[in-house]
A protein has these predicted regions:
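Adenosine-phosphate binding glycine-rich loop
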Residues: 158-159, 282-382
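N-terminal ligand-binding/catalytic initiation module
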Residues: 1-153, 375, 381
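Short, ordered loop/turn segments at secondary-structure junctions
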Residues: 69-71, 79, 108-109, 134-137, ...
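General beta-strand structural signal in soluble alpha/beta enzymes
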Residues: 105, 131-134, 155-158, 189, ...
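Glycine-rich phosphate/diphosphate-binding loop of Rossmann-like nucleotide-binding domains
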Residues: 74, 81-99, 157, 165-262
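Solvent-exposed alpha-helices and their adjacent loops that cap or buttress functional pockets
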Residues: 55-60, 96-97, 122-124, 148-149, ...
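Rossmann-like adenosine-cofactor binding region
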Residues: 232-302, 307-309
């Protein structure tokens, strides 16, 4: 039985990967009177007087909504709200299993930006945080920014920021292995969608000076055509030399490649044209931009992918459960850039210097320390 066949079989058996589990047991009339009417009126009255009391008396204190419109699901594309449900259920499982955070999958049957924003605002009172998931660019940027302005709970688009945080953590350690530094390293980010933009922003915030973005049309610069509004903002702070050309041109003399794009688009010759001991994060799934063995043969020193069957898996699960755990426990109203940087550094710090090597730059997803270390990094900045 293939993994695909097994996944389909297990999903049929599960009939959904999550369920409601009652914390209060109703075994008598007294239990019923306390859990529901008339006793339930007391916490209701307290919350009506003081909305903050919802964190004390309801699930709000440890529950997030996982919200998607199904417009950009994994490698499947725009499959719609209903077909996105298995992914959102899976995300809810990861929140609980890795961070102890309750999560509710909510798939909205609209891809209208205003309707999504209004829907999330209207359900927000029940949740301590909002995790946006698999919403296509550039709408995802506006939706997240608007919701952050409208809500007093954390709003986090994991496809953007979870990816960026783990990439930065990996790069921090990869630079230790290779002896490179952020001041002089030349970085190429291929893919100018949600993940590529967020990765570029976080690398710049961390202190990288020379970052160039590429997409299917090649190097992005101020003269590029058909850029969306976010890409137009990004070309103002990247590609400072205003280089033009293809991805191959961008990679000549580069130190670091980050791919969130398409399979098999980086060749051996491209890697060979990069600086000595190049770092490549080829994260297209399931087939990366270049296979690790090919990249290594061409001279790359450190190679990471999104896959669990290769070393250095760049996996968001080492970030988002702990981030929300910390944000909820600390009652954060937002997840800031400082928190993202601190989280990346905390994740990188989980691999001691003496254990760092080209095949070990990131902690394993199942490392039991991860969520607590990440949550502490977040809480220290609240």
């Amino acid at each position: 039985m293939t993994n695909s066949e097994k996944a389909l079989k297990m999903h049929e058996e599960w009939h959904g990967k999550i369920e409601t589990c009652a914390k209060s047991h109703v075994n008598s009339r007294e239990d019923l009177a306390i859990a529901y009417t008339p006793g339930v009126a007391e916490p209701c009255k307290v919350i009506a007087r003081d909305p903050e009391a919802a964190y004390t008396y309801t699930m709000k204190s440890n529950t997030v909504a996982v919200v998607s419109d199904g417009s950009a699901v994994l490698g499947l594309g725009n499959i719609g709200a209903l077909a996105a449900m298995p992914v959102m259920e899976g995300k809810a499982v990861l929140f609980k299993e890795f961070g102890g955070v309750n999560a509710v999958p909510i798939c909205l049957d609209t891809q209208d930006t205003e309707e999504i924003i209004k829907s999330v605002v209207n359900i927000a009172p029940a949740f301590g945080g909002i995790n946006l998931e698999d919403i296509s660019a550039p709408r995802c940027f506006e939706i997240e920014e608007r919701l952050k302005e409208l809500l007093d709970i954390p709003v986090f688009h994991d496809d953007q920021h979870g990816t960026a945080i783990v990439v930065l953590a990996g790069i921090i350690n990869a630079m230790k292995v290779t002896g490179k530094d952020k001041e002089s390293a030349k970085v190429v980010v291929n893919g100018a969608g949600s993940a590529g933009v967020a990765i570029t922003k976080l690398l710049l915030t961390y202190g990288f000076k020379d970052v160039t973005m590429c997409d299917i049309s090649g190097i992005l610069g101020k003269g590029s055509q058909n850029l969306n509004w976010m890409q137009q903002k990004m070309v103002e702070v990247t590609n400072l030399e205003q280089k033009t050309g293809t991805l191959a041109d961008a990679l000549k003399g580069a130190d670091i490649f980050v791919g969130v794009s398409a399979p098999n688009i980086v060749t051996q010759d491209m890697v060979a044209s990069m600086n000595k001991d190049a770092i490549l994060f080829a994260m297209a799934n399931p087939v990366p931009e270049i296979m690790p063995v090919i990249a290594k043969a061409a001279g790359a020193k450190v190679v990471g992918t999104g896959r669990s069957d290769f070393p250095n898996q760049v996996n968001n699960v080492v970030a988002f459960p702990g981030i929300f755990k910390g944000a909820l426990e600390g009652r954060a109203t937002a997840i800031t850039e400082e928190m993202k940087l601190a989280t990346a550094k905390a994740i990188a710090g989980l691999v001691p210097d003496e254990e760092l090597n080209e095949n070990n730059i990131l902690p394993e997803a199942f490392d039991p320390r991860v969520a607590d270390v990440v949550s502490r990094a977040v809480k220290e900045l609240i």
